[in-house]
């Protein structure tokens, strides 16, 4: 095994938590069950890494093999990446093609390798419904940097792809071109939707977040919830009817199901100064006023959902706050109509 491959493997092993080491190595599916049994998972991680390297040397592990381990690690820790959502589209009236995984991978890799001399492209099908793509970028004069790859998660037969942040901005258009052509789409656009929680982004774009409420009877549930609210002796209601109304409006707006997990929402406002009183310095200003408001929380939508019931905000909340899942965006630009 080459020295640079061994070092890449060592660093990959070192970043895996000991509690997940066995699961990740098993999911990697490179070492045999007997080899995995010989690994002492209770020793110091640097010794453990050396033990794994020796086992991989016996099997003549290549760079491609170690890259697959890095993909598996990233799948376990996908929340460590900031994911951007992209939506592709076909020409009007264009037929939907049957998806061929081998053809997709070949086309994607060919486009990148024709444009760039030094690039490493790897694939891993995950849970049969998505393909994970890992791209390590190099330059004309340097080998691909395996420590700063870009990840693409594409769901075949859908127009959606999720791409992690790329440190080389000049490669982004090429990546979009490869994805668009390989998946046989005509156009790709960046949705104003980002998060570290890939599963929540997927739930939003595929509208999976409300599946748990399909058998939900709103009238009955609201009555039961309101009754339990009134019977709770620990809560004092100054206005029971208002509390019931707030509870009803909140459930109508957010539903009873868990909200997708997003960490932030950003609103950019651009507006011209308006006044019924003519003249003045501000009225003559040609440049619009600009304002940036950012909401952040470990679980923003659940936090917004709790505002009105907690008495912090009036119900219903502004549509700008509640439309995030339906609009599929958490970056907004608000301008004069």
Curated annotation (Swiss-Prot):
Assembly behavior: Component of the CENPA-NAC complex, at least composed of CENPA, CENPC, CENPH, CENPM, CENPN, CENPT and CENPU. The CENPA-NAC complex interacts with the CENPA-CAD complex, composed of CENPI, CENPK, CENPL, CENPO, CENPP, CENPQ, CENPR and CENPS. Interacts directly with CENPA. Identified in a centromere complex containing histones H2A, H2B and H4, and at least CENPA, CENPB, CENPC, CENPT, CENPN, HJURP, SUPT16H, SSRP1 and RSF1.
A cellular component annotation (GO) from this entry: inner kinetochore
Location of the protein in the cell: Nucleus; Chromosome, Centromere; Chromosome, Centromere, Kinetochore
Protein name in the entry: Centromere protein N
Modified sites of kind Phosphoserine: 226, 233
Purpose: Component of the CENPA-NAC (nucleosome-associated) complex, a complex that plays a central role in assembly of kinetochore proteins, mitotic progression and chromosome segregation. The CENPA-NAC complex recruits the CENPA-CAD (nucleosome distal) complex and may be involved in incorporation of newly synthesized CENPA into centromeres. CENPN is the first protein to bind specifically to CENPA nucleosomes and the direct binding of CENPA nucleosomes by CENPN is required for centromere assembly. Required for chromosome congression and efficiently align the chromosomes on a metaphase plate.
Organism field: Mus musculus (Mouse)
Keyword Phosphoprotein attached: yes
Recorded family membership: Belongs to the CENP-N/CHL4 family.
InterPro entries: CENP-NAC/CAD_complex (IPR052011), Chl4/mis15/CENP-N (IPR007902)
Keywords from the UniProt entry: Centromere, Chromosome, Kinetochore, Nucleus, Phosphoprotein
Pfam family, one: CENP-N
Chief localisation class: nucleus
GO BP terms, alphabetized: CENP-A containing chromatin assembly; chromosome segregation
